[in-house]
């Protein structure tokens, strides 16, 4: 049976036993009692160490078993429960009962409960309900009398469970931190190993189970991960890595800390023995036994600090100088005094070994110490009963007392190795002096006890082997050498071999007695292996070992047999429940051999108990030494937590870290760099959203202030030195002294604790936050050179040795400086591409701008115009229909291959989507006045989506042939299917919006001509784009990147979170729109630099910021991966150049034109089509090539996943992150009286569109405007010239193009593009439709990122990545060209275009697609939708469920409405006057449609 199955059986057996014990409540009820407290205790014991949900569940089951065991006896008083608990926790966990009793009385004595006890009290009330149900119905008098008693019982049991949880988590956390090559997280496997490695917990688990258990302690041992590890390679690697001065110093420090822990273990014995030493004779025995260990402990602490300072703070090799300072003071003579003891009747000098043996013998034989070995109730409530403690004193304590002697040789060895590796002559000289001092002590040991050298050599070998992972090979070799070995593998159960050898054993068939030796065959031979968790008994047979038995260490007891019965004999008794009790009597050859075997056996059986006592001792010492921090007058971040400056959620994170609800800026910065833990999720959220309440300069100033921690005033007092016995850990409890001056011993330790636990952790976390800031949000420094210079100055100053920072701090600073240098030379997202000659020039830049960089410094490898997630192995073939490559003038919806249209648009949308940065989404920046500066990439994506919708609509309505229009309808649906397969929901919604526009949706002849397959396809798209986008959210949660989600859903969520919640928390905020406006004014005042102090005192709603950041992180999920598709430059250029709005003064004019064209091709009231016109395209063009790529072509998809009209099941893809379905703000329009719902559409929701104009950014003195490109005309070039047109067309007055400004700044004159000039054609009512004016040049394919404000345009390369401009307070915003205004705006004069009323109208503008509006009132797409209130109505109200319908727009042909005249002057959108005087309108949120309309 494997260890995995055993450990899983252990967890399941707990559950089964729980079920068999009358399970009263559900697991959800027990989770409410224990889970939250488990997380909190984990954070207290091991701050920042996460714990797995499975581990929490296992601990909960364990605590449930304890509760049922305590209440199963149906006790009616706390005293009875306490007696039951003492029986249950009889071995090793007696502190549980004591702490539970003390905490219960402490809680009951309080009359007013603090807020912190709220969760505890609620859990106790739930536990009391369980106890009441267990006790059953009672009489009323007894019920009233027992009511308070039951509450006390619940309180006692609850605190007992807390104490057990603390022990389990502390033990498991220590195991996780010490294990190598393991995830720093408490998992189920780690928890099982740690609990099975502790004897006390194993005994408790054995008592709680009803089933029989496997004999193995189970669990995945530390060495089980290295079964295939090669010992020789590991040893060679370890030795090679250790041959440096720094690595030897680190090993030296590790062993010194281990030595200090062993001294503390000796102190555990000393404190217990001193507790019963009353007379002077007894005190003299104790003094002679332990000698001057206090001075040795004090010297070890000094050497530990010396090594720490030399490793962390010094850049030079100076260990010799620090240690020799102690040597010059003759402090190493302390070891000489410890080895040479003054004792005996003649006060002669004796060796420590003899003195230790004599005093232990006197201690064991003294009647005054007899009570120490009889009672089970002792100091610290230790689990060692009388007999166990006697064996520990007799066999374990002598070995511990010899460790200081062994440690002298470790000193000598490390000093010698450092002397060989040191490159400093001064350090070598000091190390040589230290070595001479230690050699004198070593010589003293050799002269007095030559036989001790053997023990010292064995000790040093064991210490060295304990560090080698290749021990697992030794364990596997031992197991393979045992014939017939059964049970779990040794390597998965044990970590090291303690001792092995031959032992005589009394035959089990004989009855043990003092006369047994008279039998000739009374003894047999056994070869015994003692591991840390197991004893294996074997028998030699020729040249092999036969397996006989195995005993678990946690289930055995060791007994010493007096020599009066059998000489040199001891007994091992096993109490494993899986089999009958086993008793083995072993006989040794001599007393020394017996002492060695007994010492090892007692050590392995009592190790967990001694460790537990030692942990309690160290915890008590840690409480005695307070953590002194600067006061609020010295350090603003030391202000205590109150309700006025910070508040937390009622729940905690999975790692036990409290979740912040709101707090002041200072408190947010404090928790951002907290000394006890690191919350990575909080750091990411803070860096995304901090601009809502402070500027980057403010954040950097606060981080600098947080980094510069002053020394507390209490630690600045002059230190008072104590006497030679005033050691740092010298306590009243340890020596029984009446009074000791605390200033001499506590002050140095307080200073060390302040530096280790407060100052250094905070400084490291500040550097960590700066590192994340530079790595993930480089644009803050890119657009502010002053901030970047200040950061570099700070990091260079930290690297200065005079600052006294540790090496870890300096290394961190150098890493950040290297990252800054890399960002400056090669900003994130810029990648070089081969030029025409195949070389990668320095100025050549790629298309993709990776807005979010994950990892150290993600730079994508150069690719030959291929966008891929990984290194391209196989790229798809570009597919062509009837259009020829490079003939851009003939590209349209029918001539291009539908698959290639979907691919190239997907690549374009992917670049636009991935270029969006978090700063563009914070505070709904796309709706503010400076939206084109703050959210350029976001607006570029929505702008292109809107243009694509208009392009599809115009392509259809300008096609006069019905056959050709039906082919376009089919082609649009095919492209949408390609979008669906490529997970491009942005393109899919754009095409869907075109089909649902009023001018296309009314084309009944085209819709009726679709076959059933196409109708089903459209119905599927209609469901996918339904009102609340629920189906699309389900689709997103079940697919893997790459993907391009529809961005409007995210914008709606962010907008309502911004408008519906205030950034700053007020005591009683006003409600409604007026309250929101007042709060926005308060936020603006708070952001004013003059009110920065006031701002830092306001409470920031971090709950709101966390929700917004969660939405942004959902966006980031799909920004990290790209498509493995081949870029076709000419098709990319074509779709970048489309501009169906270039001939119209406003969007309404374009929409009116589209609707009139729709009426022309299908007049109202005409049910059947008239005479069919001849298509302009030939039959091969009209015939669809299909959407299944050829098999020979390499494709992004597998062969069994073709692109087709039918969407394959997406459930096969695993969802990286489930995305919540939230209500969209898509406006819908009621059906007209003349039209009915179409059967092929299940939902007539409008697709949200956004209106944008191709805005050109210009910064004075930097670079020229981006040129205009020539798109292909959508109208026939010759055949339509003579055709009559009854539809009135908008005027086609040609506005003069502004000249290109002179290049300066980053652009040179040679690289400045020139604009194209076009001739004007007078328009007439009967003339042909206007041709599309050019928007961009056609020489080079353009990237969507080329329109960034600071990005220059180059002739032979793609434009660079986006860079934010530097905005100074004194400078004005760059002039922005206008977007086409509404008719009301056109009629207004330029002088009033910047007025308040005009701005208000522009802010209320939003593009909506209305496909079911009554024709007599709304013949086209409507604009000018009013904004909803700033604060949305409360959820659940009637207003929220059914907002009022939008009022219909007045008829455009009404005489009262403003009209456009051909004589009316119209300025071009690129005109400089409009560029300055007309600010662009922001994008308001979308509105709801009434469900009952």
Curated annotation (Swiss-Prot):
Q: Where is the signal peptide?
A: none
| Residue intervals of the Ras-GEF domain | 897-1164
For bias kind Pro residues, which ranges apply? 1426-1435
The annotated consequence of gene deletion is:
RNAi-mediated knockdown results in 8% early larval lethality of the progeny. Surviving animals display slow growth, thin body morphology and both spermatogenesis and oogenesis are arrested at the pachytene stage of meiosis I. In addition, males have short and crumpled spicules. RNAi-mediated knockdown prevents multi-vulva induction in let60 n1046, let-23 sa62 or lin-15 n765 mutants and fluid accumulation in clr-1 e1745ts mutant.
Chain residue ranges for the region called Disordered: 1067-1091, 1165-1248, 1263-1493
Q: Does the keyword Chaperone apply?
A: no
Compositionally biased tracts (Basic and acidic residues):
1079-1088, 1402-1417
Q: Which key words tag this protein in UniProt? A: Guanine-nucleotide releasing factor
Any Gene Ontology CC annotation = plasma membrane
Looking up InterPro entries in the UniProt record yields: DBL_dom_sf, DH_dom, Histone-fold, PH-like_dom_sf, PH_domain, Ras-like_GEF, Ras-like_Gua-exchang_fac_N, Ras_GEF_dom_sf
Pfam families in alphabetical order? RasGEF, RasGEF_N, SOS1_NGEF_PH
- Tell me the organism: Caenorhabditis elegans
Biological processes, Gene Ontology terms: cell migration; embryo development ending in birth or egg hatching; epidermal growth factor receptor signaling pathway; female gamete generation; positive regulation of vulval development; Ras protein signal transduction
Q: What does this protein do?
A: Promotes the exchange of Ras-bound GDP by GTP. May regulate signaling pathways downstream of receptor tyrosine kinase, egl-15 and let-23. Required for larval and male spicule development, fluid homeostasis, vulva induction, spermatogenesis, and oogenesis by promoting meiosis prophase exit during oocyte maturation. Required for the delamination of G1 cell by promoting the loss of cell junctions and detachment from the excretory system during larval development. Plays a role in nicotinic acetylcholine receptor (nAChR)-mediated sensitivity to nicotine.
Low complexity compositional bias: what residue ranges?
1308-1326, 1381-1400
CDD domains hit by this protein: RasGEF (cd00155), REM (cd06224)
Domain annotation N-terminal Ras-GEF: ranges: 656-824
Is Transcription among this UniProt entry's keywords?
A: no
Q: Where is the composition biased (Polar residues)?
A: 1208-1231, 1279-1289, 1350-1361, 1453-1464
- Free-text note regarding domains: The DH (DBL-homology) domain may inhibit the Ras-GEF domain, thereby preventing excessive let-60/Ras activation.
Ranges where the PH domain occurs: 496-606
Q: What is this protein called?
A: Son of sevenless homolog
Q: Which cysteines are joined by disulfide bonds?
A: none
Q: Which GO terms describe its molecular function?
A: guanyl-nucleotide exchange factor activity; protein heterodimerization activity
Start and end residues of each DH domain = 244-448
Q: How does it assemble?
A: Interacts with cmd-1 in the presence of Ca(2+).
